[in-house]
Amino acid sequence: MSVSRRSFVASLGAGTAGLITAPLIRWHGHEALLAQGQPERRADRLLASAPGMIRVDSNENPNGPGQRALQAISNAFGHANRYPVKEEDDTLAAIAKARGVAQSNVILGCGSGELLRAAVMAFTTSDRALVAPEPTFEAPANFARFVQRPVVAPPVDAKLRLDLDAIVAASRGAGLIYFCNPNNPTATVHGGDEVASFVEAVNRASPETVILIDEAYHEYVADKSYRTAIPIAMANPHVVVTRTF
């Protein structure tokens, strides 16, 4: 996003910035409650200790962390009594350098999920909906409903691709569009030119609507037409790109 971290927090407003904490904290309990109430989750817990278990629905690495990662974790234990202020700055600087952006354009979260929830709180209201296709990664829509924000869910097309025209039509008056590219769980991809045209169409239809482009699966894309939307976000204050690692 071309605005700074300070501008993003300011967009929450003085009142909302104070109110954001309670819904975000309560949501963690809500997630646990949902998991307990779902039979497949209960079965998942029973099977979690089975030897050689591979849970492809969770995109987990069955081999676990690599040796270098384990060593880095072990080395860090000696500093666990300290607040990671310098480490946070170092991480921000490393991400900014790798992506070719200013450090002030990078925001860290506890997984991208925290940033998705913060975006819902920042950009949606009781009369400015979240637009999230169906199906897509469900966390933003689930959280929006939890905090009683309206959700509009345009269905994917016959090829399981996000229906860009339907999303543009639904964007009028919306606060936030959640655009997962590649899309989870349909594994469909929109090329760079398509995404650029889509952003322009939304800007024309609803100039104040923010578009959050989730690139969680960026590293796995083989489609040559695909491009990251980071350059679009750097040029457009109404576009945010999230990644996870």
Residue ranges and their predicted role:
Residues 1-16:
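N-terminal secretory signal peptides and thylakoid transit peptides that target proteins
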Residues 54-56, 131, 152, 212, ...:
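Hydrophobic/aromatic beta-strand patches that form the interior of the parallel beta-sheet core
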Residues 164-172, 188-211, 215-245:
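Active-site pre-lysine segment of PLP-dependent enzymes
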Residues 24-82, 173:
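N-terminal "arm"/small-domain region of PLP-dependent enzymes with the aminotransferase-like
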Residues 90-129:
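Phosphate-binding glycine-rich loop
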Residues 122-180:
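PLP-dependent aminotransferase-like
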Residues 111, 117, 135, 221-223:
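Short N-terminal helix/helix-N-cap motif within the alpha/beta-hydrolase-1
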